[in-house]
């Protein structure tokens, strides 16, 4: 009777090892950078690496991250949406006005989402059907949406007194702020959509090669409209959370949030040329920006210098995006 010996599997043959390598290859750079920043700011200021401050960082980036989830969809198609900041302001003021008219919060949520869908349909229709470049369309609607927010409010903030509405941005569940729960839930939902559904695969295929997508039977026009609608809905959710946190709908809120959303997505590995990126990378990018902002605030760095740093971060992220594109091609 002979004895059979089983060969030990190589590390590359172990699923867990493969998954770890894949995750590290995809997110290792940005995660390493974030860890270095956390260590640096922790040495500079003792109050940085505390439970309260870490929670505060996540809470502060939640609105940008949720908006950036939507931006990821658009960038994956090779388009862009510069109207998300104005969408946040308009939906926030819309919801605040509804609350001031006595509309129950349980009705305000679907009404605000429907309003956001309409804004997304405008952007998507002008881009996909009229054939106007998304950059031009969303620059125009950025001004239009913001202008409407000023018109309906007479340029004044609309105070929110509805307790349920205020709980959206300021309440807690199991000692964790509600915006963080929303951030996590939307991360899981959008990650599932992009990685496990036919709709998500169509987005990657279209962003990677539009001609091939058309030849394979994908209705690119319909897909693009849906993507812009999703982006608007996520911006609308951010708008309701921001209005709640500010205790008012403000037409001048969310200024330059579109740049923060783009920075988070690109820093997290989403390509500006389409076809490559994930919402997991996007949330890591948003958290990295949050760490930078929080660290500089604790160091009392003036806001104008923070703008310079944020601009440099975007430039570096775009540089690596271009370099990675050359490698992939």
Task: Please provide the spans of the model-predicted regions.
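Membrane-interfacial amphipathic/re-entrant helices at transmembrane-helix boundaries
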Residues: 2-66, 102-107, 218, 226
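Short loop segments and helix-boundary regions at transmembrane helix junctions
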Residues: 17-23, 80, 115-158, 196-198, ...
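Hydrophobic alpha-helical transmembrane segments
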Residues: 27-32, 57, 65, 86-90, ...
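Hydrophobic core segments of alpha-helical transmembrane domains in multi-pass membrane transport
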Residues: 30-42, 71, 146, 182-192, ...
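Single transmembrane alpha-helix segments in multi-pass membrane proteins
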Residues: 35-101, 126-131, 269-279, 312
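Helix-loop-helix "hairpin" substructures at the membrane interface of multi-pass membrane proteins
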Residues: 104-110, 118-123, 127, 173-249
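Transmembrane helix-bundle core of multi-pass membrane transporters
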Residues: 130, 134-197, 223-226, 245-254, ...
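Transmembrane alpha-helical segments in multi-pass inner-membrane proteins
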Residues: 235, 245-311
């Amino acid at each position: 009777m002979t004895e059979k010996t089983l060969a030990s599997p190589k590390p590359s043959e172990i699923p867990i090892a493969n998954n770890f390598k894949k995750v590290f290859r995809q997110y290792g750079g940005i995660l390493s950078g974030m860890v270095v920043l956390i260590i640096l700011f922790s040495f500079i200021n003792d109050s940085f690496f505390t439970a309260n401050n870490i929670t505060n960082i996540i809470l502060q980036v939640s609105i940008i991250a949720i908006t950036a989830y939507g931006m990821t969809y658009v960038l994956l198609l090779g388009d862009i949406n510069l109207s998300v900041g104005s969408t946040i302001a308009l939906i926030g003021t819309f919801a605040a006005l509804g609350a001031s008219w006595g509309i129950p919060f349980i009705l305000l949520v679907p009404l605000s989402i429907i309003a956001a869908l309409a804004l997304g349909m405008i952007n998507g229709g002008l881009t996909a059907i009229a054939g106007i470049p998304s950059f031009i369309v969303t620059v125009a609607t950025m001004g239009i949406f913001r202008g409407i927010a000023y018109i309906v409010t007479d340029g004044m903030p609309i105070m929110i007194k509805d307790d349920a509405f205020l709980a959206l941005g300021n309440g807690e569940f199991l000692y964790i702020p509600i915006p963080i729960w929303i951030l996590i839930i939307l991360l899981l939902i959008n990650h599932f959509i992009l990685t496990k559904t036919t709709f998500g695969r169509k987005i990657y295929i279209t962003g990677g090669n539009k001609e091939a997508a058309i030849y394979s039977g994908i209705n690119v026009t319909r897909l693009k409209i849906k993507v812009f609608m999703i982006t608007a809905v996520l911006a609308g959710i951010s708008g309701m959370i921001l209005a709640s946190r500010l205790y008012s709908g403000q037409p001048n809120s969310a200024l330059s949030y579109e740049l923060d959303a783009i920075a988070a997505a690109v820093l997290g590995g989403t390509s500006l040329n389409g076809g490559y990126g994930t919402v997991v990378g996007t949330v890591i990018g948003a958290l990295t920006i949050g760490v930078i902002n929080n660290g500089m605030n604790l160091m009392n760095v003036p806001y104008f210098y923070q703008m310079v740093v944020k601009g440099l971060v975007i430039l570096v992220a775009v540089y690596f995006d271009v370099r990675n594109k050359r490698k992939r091609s």
